[in-house]
């Protein structure tokens, strides 16, 4: 799987505290190899929200929302649970 970053994701990522960026980096390193392999993504908290729309957990309060397009995972949003809910409601 290839990771692609939306402009909104990059903007939100840059606004994170350095420790949150480190948690996010760790999750993003594990995501491509773990996606589609249930036993590998146990620590990521990866789950489907809708068809082709997913979220994973970077830390207890930080989540990453993304969509799947063939062999590419497009990272759309990073933030707390409310940010993911807002993204789902407004963008999809």
Question: How should these model regions be labeled?
Answer:
Residues 1-29:
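Arg/Lys-rich, positively charged N-terminal/basic patches that mediate binding to nucleic acids
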Residues 2, 14-15, 21, 54-92:
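Enriched for short, Lys/Arg-rich terminal
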Residues 3, 22-25, 39-43, 78:
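Non-catalytic, surface-exposed connector residues within folded enzymatic/regulatory domains
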Residues 8, 48-49, 69-70:
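Short glycine-enriched loop/turn motifs at secondary-structure junctions
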Residues 9, 37-42, 71, 77:
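Preference for short coil/turn "hinge" residues that link or interrupt alpha-helices
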Residues 12, 27-30, 34, 87, ...:
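Residues that form generic nucleotide/phosphate-binding pockets
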Residues 30-57:
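A short, surface-exposed loop/turn module that caps and links secondary-structure elements
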């Amino acid at each position: 799987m290839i990771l692609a970053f939306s402009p909104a994701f990059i903007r939100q990522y840059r606004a994170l505290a350095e420790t949150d960026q480190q948690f996010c980096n760790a999750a993003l390193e594990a995501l491509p190899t773990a996606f589609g392999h249930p036993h590998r993504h146990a620590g990521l908290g990866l789950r489907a929200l809708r068809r082709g729309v997913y979220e994973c957990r970077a830390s207890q309060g930080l989540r990453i929302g993304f969509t799947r397009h063939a062999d590419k995972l497009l990272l759309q949003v990073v933030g707390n649970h409310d940010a993911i809910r807002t993204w789902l409601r407004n963008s999809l």
